[in-house]
Amino acid sequence: MILLAIETSCDETAISIVKRVRGKQVRFEVLSNKILSQIDLHTQYGGVFPMLAKREHTKAITQLIAEALGEADLLVERTNSYHIPSALRKKLDAQLMREPEMLSAMKVLFEGIQKPTIDAIAVTEGPGLEPALWVGINAALALGMMWDIPIYPVNHMEGHIVAGLLSIENDVYEISDTDYPATALLISGGHTELVNIPKLRSYSVVGKTRDDAVGEAFDKAARMLLLPYPGGPEISRLAEHARKEGLVVDEDLRLPRPMLHSGDLHFSFSGLKTAVLTRVKKRGTINEEEKRMIALEFENAVTDVLVAKVKQAMYETRSSTLIIGGGVSANTHIRFAMKNLAEREGFSLFVPNRNLSTDNGIMIAATGLLHIAEDKKPKVKLVANGSWSVEGC
């Protein structure tokens, strides 16, 4: 089986083509993996601007699909002139009536190449930015209609869980088998969640942020320190520098650990963001050393809270496995802290490869293959759902 995956939930246009390998577990080879990031375009806004994201997805997606097909040796150009039949053209026009730029590009693609040997399409249906999600969904629906290929909608957060479980050996990816129940910590720019997993594909959110997501808090704190977007890597870079030089944080720059002792599994990071602002304003101007102090204290505060909540969740759900996913899971200090926690408490830890931490098509492809392996039915009608919970997938 060959599957094409589409991911457009935020500011990365990602296309992957994978080929399933025989075996009991979900195992596959990656034939192509394309990612086009919009980070440079969104820097001026200090965050992702939804309609700009939609526009850039629309401009890029058809060409990226063609490039992925070519890299996977699945693109065969037509030798004879071909025109889309009138009835099918009308359906395509109706499907992409709100995406005229994509419509023109798709017509060129369909009339210029033969139908590729693709057996299924997986596409992110949510959560995420709905204008961006619609671009990927409409592209998937157009491909499915023109080439008569079934479509499997994927929950983006389940994709991050599956990414955490992926192992790679001899260029073959496999969804690792592990002991359940498990707990997943999903940390990104839009989500901070603790998910109980009695078994794979059965999810219950047991804790989440009441305000800012952890990645959002990193970005906002970075802006207060006049650091470039995206702020998370910049905060981490300064924090690591501070650790290496043994920098001691000034007492008046110490930060709170919000909801550390709340007794529940929920999070709140808006107070931490406000605390950073208060300390910056109190100093008036801050030098580079003070920036490193605040970055160090901020990263430590976030990590302390995450570790405490994970430890409590593991105990309450009696989990034997911790899975970490989402863009913030690439943070070196958080990874190190979770590794130490797992070793102390005696549970298994799964973290994604760094290239699978941020949004990508491989995690959507793997999740789509998992759905197919469990005989989940494809869908004909898809709707972008910006708030689709992993519980409902």
Residues covered by each model-derived region:
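DPxDG-like acidic metal-binding loop motif
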Residues: 130-147
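Conserved phosphate-binding/catalytic loops in two-lobed NTP-binding clefts
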Residues: 153-154, 322, 338-364
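Glycine-rich phosphate-binding/hydrolytic loop that grips phosphoryl groups
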Residues: 160-163, 352-391
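Glycine-rich beta-strand-to-loop/alpha-helix junction loops that act as flexible
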Residues: 124-126, 143, 188, 322-331
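N-terminal beta-alpha supersecondary unit
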Residues: 2-117, 123, 127
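A contiguous, well-structured pocket-lining segment that forms one wall/lid of small-molecule binding clefts
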Residues: 60, 75-93, 97-112, 237-322, ...
